[in-house]
């Protein structure tokens, strides 16, 4: 059953069942959805996977529409052979600053025997004649990308940049300061099991 509320620009559904080939695979006793293009807080599509190394892998992201220029996505992930991982993505945009901060954290990896994490922050801005920014990338260990596929991996050739910069521009002169450090992923240390 579905109810549409045009005044609130939202719909409500009850007793929904997703069937594949006539077989029920997912059910929801209650859910809401927007009727317009406006963003709305709520669950996003879950992601299911399975592999011999990770076992059953289930992610259920929840999107928080904090404000028109701020949002946050929390993604709990259960990996049956490894443990529980929490993914985070925070995005923001205002007059002098914009960026995104993403991270994943696993308090204890059953296979690795320790905590695991990744962090990416890309923040940039300008104010008057100044420009500034941070591009920070870090993982807990050399094997993180092989064990947990992540978008941070797409941006690197086994070197994770950690850049901070500030520049000033005027009609007659320019100045810039940049501090750079890298985390090198040592592929020769990675074991294959």
Where are these regions (language model features)?
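Outer-membrane beta-barrel proteins and related beta-barrel translocases across Gram-negative bacteria
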Residues: 1-193
